[in-house]
């Protein structure tokens, strides 16, 4: 008779856990009865119920390994997700993806993100298991007789194309690429200061996607010490927006939320990306071929650019008044790409929900009967002092002007001028952050700041002090 016998642990795969959830939802069986059926303990069934939402999100993502019993989170989740996006793009282009290619690409992505990471064979094996990835050429047996052609579908039996009426307003999204000269000032335009901004929001204005920005610089000096997750927007080192990568991330996010959404795009773009594999939760809806309306209403784009220009002029004015003798050109040259990303995020957050909702309805891009009436003051950012309404409106659309190539050559590298000899500036310490709080509070005290402003400062002070304690 064996005395020291250990009960063998029986772990359930993801597919079996989904069966457990379905059984509990569809029948009147108790957790104990389900546990006996699957030959596991009742606490294990209880944990499955507790993690129901996460398990369903993994199941719906389309990338999870359904037969895997345990899921370990990757230490380098950012690299993990970026490599998965690249892998889907490569497979969509019918590339023969190999292990060495993935290892090389993972190291390249880690360098771009500023992470000290060296991928190994073991890491690659675990990455493939986590994301249910397999690659390599497969031999396909050619049948002796060609398969019969499927019967033709009569027009009456064909499924009608999806339209806006098939989605709720919260699940209808529009997007637009917006060129932005992030350091432009009235009367001076520099082509080398160009960014490409991708904005996306739903027709209710209740959900704005994280801004995606493409830039000319692969690794700006101002990004030193800042992880990609800490950037206020997503950044891509190229003015050409990687649509397949962005769509794959959008689809993954919607899958985790268990949603089916529509993305409005120009008819030509929809035809180009219709064959993109892996889009399970985002349906591309084409605008009419004769339509000149962008999928994100023009008034929304104009409001975003107006808020950005207003914030830029305020920042330049503060720089000039803060240090005597600072010219407008010097203040403009000190604006970095990182400064621009922060101002882009702030400007996008400033676009009111009511404006987005009204604009979608007015242009017929969302289900609705009558557009909402908005005050003109809420549609545009207030005109900065020193400019007329006409001058500010022209300043907002400076991207339409044609800058000379000579100016672009003169402005190359102005952002990093004066720093090349000393290298990168040292990163601020916790002591520097606390001292900066003291300096800011003292300045507010000496300039008779309002109680409302002090309340905002106190909130910031508490957050910074808590970060310093970590």
Curated annotation (Swiss-Prot):
Domain (DDE-1) ranges: 167-360
UniProt biased composition (Basic and acidic residues): 402-421
Keywords: DNA-binding, Nucleus
Domain HTH psq-type: from-to ranges: 3-55
DNA-binding region residue numbers: 31-51, 100-130
Compartments reported by the entry: Nucleus
Record-linked InterPro entries: CenT-Element_Derived (IPR050863), DDE_SF_endonuclease_dom (IPR004875), Homeodomain-like_sf (IPR009057), HTH_CenpB_DNA-bd_dom (IPR006600), HTH_Psq (IPR007889)
SMART domains named in the record: CENPB (SM00674)
One family name in Pfam for this protein: HTH_Tnp_Tc5
Domain HTH CENPB-type: 67-137
MF terms (GO), sorted A to Z: DNA binding
Region (Disordered): 402-426
GO annotation, cellular component aspect: nucleus
Family of this protein: Belongs to the tigger transposable element derived protein family.
PANTHER family in the record: TIGGER TRANSPOSABLE ELEMENT-DERIVED PROTEIN 3 (PTHR19303:SF36), TRANSPOSON (PTHR19303)
Name recorded for this polypeptide: Tigger transposable element-derived protein 3
Organism: Mus musculus
The encoding gene: Tigd3
